[in-house]
Amino acid sequence: MKAGYFTLAAALMMMCWSQVQAGVVVGGTRLIYDGAKKESALSINNPDAVPYLIQSWVDAQEGDSAKAPFIITPPLFRLDGGQNNLLRVVRAGGNLPADKESLYWLNVKAIPSVEKKDNTLQIAIKTRIKLIYRPQGLSGNLEEAVGKLAWRRSGNRLQVSNPSPYYLTFFNLKLNGSAVAGSTMVAPQATASFSLPAGSGAGGSLSWQIINDYGGTGQTFTSTL
């Protein structure tokens, strides 16, 4: 009986895993828009057998009422099974800072094509990635920007100041080996604050990595408080 339960459980897990793997694949976790170019592109792939209706758009950051100054072509199209396409992102005006990066959100919604049946639920899959506009001629690079970060403790908070013109996204930020929860990113020429791990005393050693333009991580950086 136990072996039967294990077999059934394994089969259910494999079914769930297949569903997770199915669907439209967006070619990146972020898109860096080079201000020196007229457009940027993002690949969309459909490894499924069924077609999807793809809808895409760009949002401003939460709390920003201004319309995002980017358009996507094509904004709505059918993507058949086994096919791929490119989303072309084009800047459409907007008074963006020339001395630092600007952050927006690129949304891709994939709606599967299914036969119309009673009592069926159609589920759309939405993917949201960072769209970072990088003005032409910014000084330095991400690696140099990391070296300019200034860390300090403020009560039970960890503060980091970023004087560089780049958005820096943290990965695996730790204090004395304990993960710093909620440590996401710090905007250019700004300060971010995160909760310190429970029980962390005065001082300590920090370690972290930065997510690069391609969504990967590089070397581990260290600092002391």
Model-found features: residue ranges?
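Bacterial N-terminal signal peptides that target proteins for export
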Residues: 1-8
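N-terminal signal peptide c-region/cleavage motif recognized by signal peptidases
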Residues: 17-19
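Beta-sheet-dominated interaction scaffolds and their linkers
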Residues: 22-43, 141-150
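Short acidic, flexible loop segments centered on an aromatic residue
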Residues: 47-65, 163-180
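Terminal connector regions
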Residues: 94-138, 144-146, 202-225
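Intrinsically disordered, low-complexity segments enriched in serine, threonine, and glycine
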Residues: 152-225
